[in-house]
Amino acid sequence: MAEQNCEIAWFSALCDDDYEFLGVPDKYLQSSWEHCRNIVLRAEEGGFDNILLPSGYQLGLDTTAFAAAVATQVRRIKLLWATRMGEDWPPQLARRIATLDRILGPNAEGTGGRLNVNIISSDMPGETIASGPRYARATEIMKIVRTLLNGEHLDFQGEFYKLKLDPPRIGTISGRCPAFYFGGLSHDARECAAEASDVYLMWPDTMDKVRETIADMKARAANYGRTLRFGYRVHVVVRETEDEARAYADRLLSKLDDEAGKAIREKSLDAKNFGVQRQQELRGAADGDGFVEENLWTGIGRARSGCGAAIVGTPDQVLAKLRAYQAEGIEAFILSGYPHAQEADMFARYVLPHINHGPLNI
């Protein structure tokens, strides 16, 4: 059987989340236009299909301004632009997406644009909304934006928004709404994803849990008459030998103060959500070296909220792990490593040439 195709994305550390030693700030790795642009350019040069531009409020760069600027610097790679639901009036969000897509330009085939959207539904500063209403609002926003960017007249009467509008004059290159990538583990998050997103993103977990989550999300989407694609967000440490990879992982934590790591985790607006709690559970279930299953190392979660584990091993081991996820239904990977520019080069050298990959077509 031929190897299935998948999308391989990297991560640009816009939120002051780049280190040589986890938890130890380095002025040369702090988020700046030059540094984060360099990560994007290295990812494009290395052959990655897509790159996540994350969103944060307390640290780093503004995602929208960065995306618009870096869109003029790249020629092939897609951008996965993160945006938080509720920070924009939905029709304005639709216009912003269309504008970014136009700046970024067409894909290699000339069949559409190169922008994807990472939908985030966390609380915002000064705002606390219960999970149910917050995800219901996100669902409404995605439906509104999709209708407008598909070039259709909008007549929407929801709980949060009541709108009658024609689509914006400026549309996307394809004339359709870009793909929505969305993640969340709670019941409300899963229902939101099933009803309105395109790619359901998972953070690191055991293979059994990945299999269980995919089955659950397929069933939920079917209840809405829809199908989902599946993505996996994970860090990676790849070296020529397993000993070298494990030694590098240990080195990342060699200067970490546990209190400093805790402070970093608690700064995040999503520090108390279901997904973060699950990452904590994985660390608690790991062995003495931090591995919760073969080649899945949870040490990174000691110094960051959110995605808290890494695939650690040789090129063959990393490739085997990715293929195992593919066999369960994962079609898109969002990878990262510390420091991000260096580790993009490592993955591009050792693993990427051996993967049948390309942009996810939705």
UniProtKB/Swiss-Prot annotation:
Top class in the EC scheme: oxidoreductase
GO biological process, one term: alkanesulfonate catabolic process
InterPro entries on file: Luciferase-like_dom (IPR011251), Luciferase-like_sf (IPR036661), SsuD_RutA_monooxygenase (IPR050172)
Keyword annotations of the record: Carbohydrate metabolism, Flavoprotein, FMN, Monooxygenase, Oxidoreductase
SUPFAM superfamilies linked to this entry: Bacterial luciferase-like (SSF51679)
Catalytic reaction list: 6-sulfo-D-quinovose + FMNH2 + O2 = 6-dehydro-D-glucose + FMN + sulfite + H2O + 2 H(+)
Pfam families: Bac_luciferase
E.C. numbers: 1.14.14.181
GO molecular function: alkanesulfonate monooxygenase activity
Family: Belongs to the SsuD family.
Function, in words: Part of the alkanesulfonate monooxygenase (sulfo-ASMO) pathway, a D-sulfoquinovose degradation pathway that enables the complete utilization of all carbons within sulfoquinovose (SQ) with concomitant production of inorganic sulfite. Catalyzes the oxidative desulfurization of sulfoquinovose to sulfite and 6-dehydro-D-glucose.
Protein name: Sulfoquinovose monooxygenase
